Structures are given as structure tokens and as C-alpha cells.
UniProtKB/Swiss-Prot annotation:
Cell location: Endoplasmic reticulum-Golgi intermediate compartment membrane; Golgi apparatus, cis-Golgi network membrane; Endoplasmic reticulum membrane
Any one GO biological process: retrograde vesicle-mediated transport, Golgi to endoplasmic reticulum
Residues bearing PTM Phosphoserine: S116
Side of membrane Lumenal, spans: 47-340
Modified residues (N-acetylmethionine): M1
Identification of the protein by name: Endoplasmic reticulum-Golgi intermediate compartment protein 3
Region named Required for MARCHF2-mediated degradation: 1-25
Main localization of the protein described in the UniProt heading: endoplasmic reticulum
Length: 382
């Protein structure tokens, strides 16, 4: 018993008898409000604890031979699908080989509504034209090239063959004077889509090297190791490259990613504008808390625009160009659970802090009320 008596001397929380305790309405109000605040702060701390935190790290990118997946969804409200070509080039200006892609073109009317329910699958570097059914023609025929024959081009059985032959000569005749083009409805196709727009969506998988992909009018080809587009045969007088980028990303999305070009609306101030997007791609590895590893990319971008009146030379080519280069550094983002001890510390701080503040407020209210009451009572006696 003597030992217990000595132990009581260390009690930092001495108790008073119940008869000497005074309960007030102000104290009850402070208790209820502080209890609600304590519960709210506890739930906030619990929610914070249940979320994961992401730790970034920076490494040198040592990956080799990987592919770069480019997700595309771009609308051209004033550029018909029949006129639009899409190409992927490497840093040297050569057309990329072994490019896997799944791109589609959707014709749009002037209000942006799809003209047809099905989109056309697009081949890189080609424009879409309606081809006459070959079943009714002699498969062994050899039709005229209209004076544009060459050593490797003796027969021109399609409008595209005639256009290619004349392209090498530097000029293309009126398609209405060429039997193959009349038969395939080349002019009708161009006229039919003249006031339409086009939505291009899908993905490209290119080699993981610096390069570009672009949307430009006309048929593309290589001439003396220079990439050019044939616009003459399409009769394009007013090239409007106004565009709306619904989505553009390099790889899969991960939680919290920001694609800076999403929902970008650009209006061409005049005809024949060339829009260039200079993109810096940063390889990124995102490791989820369950162990799943996601290899993707982030990117930053700057935009430049100018008038392009020429088909070759410094004036450039009307269109939308995305020129990308890859960073030598890699970002690793790792999801981790938050510390349980940190959660306990936060809860204790909330409870202790609220009790302390509530006690101070209650004491202030109680003693202030007593002081006021004393003055009132003193005034009555005098």
C-alpha cells in the first residue's frame, strides 16, 4: 500500500470529486463541435492513409530495340479525308519502315457529324480514292499512260498509275481527260468530299528513334531523298489546316498522367498554314502497388506555325507536323502504401490537439462568463 501511495505522486491527471465538477451549456457546445471536427479530421487522415503515394526516380534510359506507340485522335473540320495523307518519318527524313499501325479516317460533314457509320482504314502515305471494280476489266490489259510512259512504267491500268507516271514528269493532266480516272470516279470523289471534314484516329507503332509524323494534303512520295506531297492533282486552292486534337499520347496512360495536347483547338488564321509541334518524349516506368509494371512515356511540347506557300524549299508544306525526340533519361514512378506509424501519429495529433484547444476554449468561455456575472451581481448590490 505504501508503494501504491508513492506511485500516486506521479499522477499528472489529478481527479476531483464529482460533486465539485460544474457542467455548463458552453462546455457541452464546445464538446460537440470539437467531437465533430475530430471525426472529420480523422476521416480525412484515414482517406489520406488509404491512398498510395508516388515516389519519382531518375535513371539513364538503357532500353534498346523498343517500339514507340503513338495514340492519335485528331479532327480536321475543313480537310476532306480524300485529300488527307498521313506519314511517319525518321530523323533523317526517310519514311519509317516496319511501322505497325491501325489508323482510321472518318468522314465528317460541315457540322462535325460522321457522314457514314463506318470509318475507312488508312494506309500510311496514301489518300483514299474510290477504285473501280476490276472484275469487269481484262486482268491482262495494258492501258495508255497518255505519253508519260517510262522504262519501268509501260502500262497505266488505274488512275493512280497515270498520276504516278505524270508525277515523274512533273505535271499531272486534267483527270477528266483520262479514261482511267473517269472510270474510277476520281473527280466525283474529290468534288463529293470538297466541303467535308475528317477525323483521324488510331495508333502508330514506330521505331524508338527521333522522327515525325504529319497530316498533310496530297499524295506523298520520295523524290531525290526528299519527302514531298503532290497537291496539283487534287486542285486544292484554299488549304485550311484548322484542327482539334482530341487526344495524343505516346504509350499507355497511367494514374495522374497529363497529356498536354489533349483537347487542343487550333484555328488556322489563313490558308496554307504549317503547324509544327516539337515534342520531347520522356520514357517512363510506372510501378503499381500490386507489382504491375507499366512502360509508357510522358512528353512536353511547344508549337510553331507559319505560312507555307511552296511545295518544296524553306517555305515548307501545309499541314500538321509532330516532330518528336526522345530524352536519354528515364523516369521511374513507384506507388507505395503510406506508413501506418505516420497514420497513428496523425490520429494522435488530431485527438490531442482537439482536446487541448477545446479545453482552452471551454476555460476561456467559462471564466469570461463568471467574470461578467460577478460584475452584474456587483452592480445590483450597489
Amino acid at each position: 500500500m505504501e508503494a501504491l501511495g508513492k506511485l500516486k505522486q506521479f499522477d499528472a491527471y489529478p481527479k476531483t470529486l464529482e460533486d465539485f465538477r460544474v457542467k455548463t451549456c458552453g462546455g457541452a457546445t464546445v464538446t460537440i463541435v470539437s467531437g465533430l471536427l475530430m471525426l472529420l479530421l480523422f476521416l480525412s487522415e484515414l482517406q489520406y492513409y488509404l491512398t498510395t503515394e508516388v515516389h519519382p526516380e531518375l535513371y539513364v534510359d538503357k532500353s534498346r530495340g523498343d517500339k514507340l506507340k503513338i495514340n492519335i485522335d485528331v479532327l480536321f473540320p475543313h480537310m476532306p479525308c480524300a485529300y488527307l495523307s498521313i506519314d511517319a518519318m525518321d530523323v533523317a527524313g526517310e519514311q519509317q519502315l516496319d511501322v505497325e499501325h491501325n489508323l482510321f479516317k472518318q468522314r465528317l460533314d460541315k457540322d462535325g457529324t460522321p457522314v457514314s457509320s463506318e470509318a475507312e482504314r488508312h494506309e500510311l502515305g496514301k489518300v483514299e480514292v474510290t477504285v473501280f471494280g476490276p472484275d469487269s476489266l481484262d486482268p491482262d490489259r495494258c492501258e495508255s499512260c497518255y505519253g508519260a510512259e517510262a522504262e519501268d512504267i509501260k502500262c497505266c491500268n488505274t488512275c493512280e498509275d497515270v498520276r504516278e507516271a505524270y508525277r515523274r514528269r512533273g505535271a499531272f493532266k486534267n483527270p477528266d481527260t483520262i479514261e482511267q480516272c473517269r472510270r474510277e470516279g476520281f473527280s466525283q470523289k474529290m468534288q463529293e468530299q470538297k466541303n467535308e471534314g475528317c477525323q483521324v484516329y488510331g495508333f502508330l507503332e514506330v521505331n524508338k528513334v527521333a522522327g515525325n509524323f504529319h497530316f498533310a494534303p496530297g499524295k506523298s512520295f520520295q523524290q531525290s531523298h526528299v519527302h514531298v506531297h503532290d497537291l496539283q492533282s487534287f486542285g486544292l486552292d484554299n488549304i485550311n489546316m484548322t484542327h482539334y486534337i482530341q487526344h495524343l499520347s505516346f504509350g499507355e496512360d497511367y494514374p495522374g498522367i497529363v497529356n498536354p495536347l489533349d483537347h487542343t483547338n487550333v484555328t488556322a488564321p489563313q490558308a496554307s498554314m504549317m503547324f509544327q509541334y516539337f515534342v520531347k518524349v520522356v520514357p517512363t516506368v510506372y510501378m503499381k502497388v500490386d507489382g504491375e509494371v507499366l512502360r509508357t512515356n510522358q512528353f512536353s511540347v511547344t508549337r510553331h506555325e507559319k505560312v507555307a506557300n511552296g511545295l518544296l524549299g524553306d517555305q515548307g508544306l501545309p499541314g500538321v507536323f509532330v516532330l518528336y525526340e526522345l530524352s536519354p533519361m528515364m523516369v521511374k514512378l513507384t506507388e507505395k502504401h503510406r506508413s501506418f506509424t505516420h497514420f497513428l501519429t496523425g490520429v494522435c495529433a488530431i485527438i490531442g490537439g482537439m482536446f487541448t484547444v477545446a479545453g482552452l476554449i471551454d476555460s476561456l468561455i467559462y471564466h469570461s462568463a463568471r467574470a461578467i456575472q460577478k460584475k452584474i451581481d456587483l452592480g445590483k448590490t450597489t
